[in-house]
Amino acid sequence: MDSFKGGMNLERLPESLRPQPSHDMATSFHLQRSSEARDPMDNSASESSDTEIAEKERTGEPKGEDGNGDDPSKKKKQRRQRTHFTSQQLQELEATFQRNRYPDMSMREEIAVWTNLTEARVRVWFKNRRAKWRKRERNQQMDLCKNGYVPQFSGLMQPYDEMYAGYPYNNWATKSLTPAPLSTKSFTFFNSMSPLSSQSMFSGPSSISSMSMPSSMGHSAVPGMANSSLNNINNLNNISGSSLNSAMSSTGCPYGPPGSPYTVYRDTCNSSLASLRLKSKQHSTFGYSSLQSPASSLNACQYNS
């Protein structure tokens, strides 16, 4: 047996008949035991996670890293306390707003000292006040545009005439916007005009009607009108007698006679007494030809004398 065992060569046996080493069997047995032990642990862990998720969904807890939801008091915003202004503070603020709608830092600090407020509160008040003023201006312009009138000076509109009406600084709303009545003025041109010239200037329709008057109706008006025309011509001759005599005795002048600049206001009367008498005898219609003023008959040299 020993010889047989000693003489027996294991290398000549096939691999299937060879005995396996003992350490390989131990490792395989250990791996099998570890896999069997791992499976129930994994199953228990998955079951515990599923139960935790179901409980969280049932209770309505938000899912987070720590499993704890945020504090609801932190989510709610803290409401700022409103500032209640007194009537004196509002009076100072409104008076400043009417003077300047965009005060700088120094002015806001002064207002804060006057009104016993902080500069931040004054700044916020002016910001809100400007927003209200712009909204009111916009509404007024829309109303005026609907009525068919577009204001050209919208910036001159005063804001909020119904607010703080009892204060003295807001008296602009009670002031009358109507202009002062036109005072009686003395016009030297019309006062210096003679009744004849004023009658001749503003009696166009009457003269036209007299010209279109039939000859049968004009007989009674001939003597009176002829006498008034004669008196006017005599007055003009007396006034311009001295100037005409000096013009006749003066030497010749190279300049031509100047034109009268006031041709519109020339007196319309008859040129001579003879033509008036002739027309009055013939009972013709009355047409007044223009009579040159005494100054127009003088030449340029006689103006200097």
Swiss-Prot record:
Spans annotated as Interaction with PIT-1: 138-270
DNA-binding region ranges: 78-137
Position of sequence motif OAR: 271-284
Matching Pfam families: Homeodomain, OAR
Gene Ontology molecular function: any one: DNA-binding transcription factor activity
Job of this protein: Sequence-specific transcription factor that binds gene promoters and activates their transcription. May play a role in the development of anterior structures, and in particular, the brain and facies and in specifying the identity or structure of hindlimb.
Name of the protein described by the UniProt record: Pituitary homeobox 1
Lineage: Eukaryota, Metazoa, Chordata, Craniata, Vertebrata
